[in-house]
Amino acid sequence: MGYRILTLNQISVRGLERFPRDRYEVASSLAHPDAILLRSADLHSVEIAPSVLAVGRAGAGTNNVPVAALSKRGVPVFNAPGANSNAVKELVIASLFLAARNICQAWDFARGLSGDDKTIDEATEKGKKSFAGFELPGRTLGVIGLGAIGVEVANAAERLGMRVIGYDPDITVQRAWQLSASIEQARSLDELFSRSQFVTVHIPLVEGTRGLVNSTRLQLMPE
């Protein structure tokens, strides 16, 4: 008899192909599953069947999984740290460009133009300076959490010419070796916020990190 795997989210076909059908039954609706595979579904709010022997999350964080409760039951929780690090890095860098160069506002402005070519040209010349923004080289990015994602973000921003400050009191030796030597270390969160024009956070949302970014710390950031 094969193992029964309950999927609670859409999982990549390439990932599911790793479970041969002659040994595994994989479905989004199963009674008495041996394992649960999920992405963003919140396991805190559902009853986990006594038959479950393992839980796997297709992602890095496990804040949507009751790890402590499952550990007491002897149920291991597996995750995939770093699996989405490049995708997240690209989105963070894209967000920096969006914020610095007023791209969304310029897009809305351009879509709102109407009239003949002469009218549009005149409106463009008159309005385009409002969206110039500023360039990223020389600006400071604070990175909170230097795991797989944080390190990639920090290194990418540094290659863009940004000054990068990192904060992670629990950084591993492996991640430290991967980090560019030019990345500066912040001794505290308050120091990081007070020196950064942009801040990006790459740590799990748990009770110990909830409220880490707050109005008091945001007010420390330079104008």
Question: Language-model segments: which ranges?
Answer:
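Gly/Ala-rich phosphate-binding loop of Rossmann-like dinucleotide-binding domains
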Residues: 154, 158
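An N-terminal-biased, well-structured beta-alpha scaffold segment characteristic
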Residues: 1-80, 194, 214
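Phosphate-binding beta-alpha-beta segment of Rossmann-like dinucleotide-binding domains, i.e.
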Residues: 81-140
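Rossmann-like adenosine-cofactor binding region
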Residues: 44-46, 169-223
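Structural/interface elements that position substrates and couple domains in central-metabolism enzymes
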Residues: 3-6, 10-14, 21-26, 85-87, ...
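Conserved S-adenosyl-L-methionine
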Residues: 159-163
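Glycine-rich Rossmann-fold phosphate-binding loop(s) that bind the pyrophosphate
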Residues: 146-147
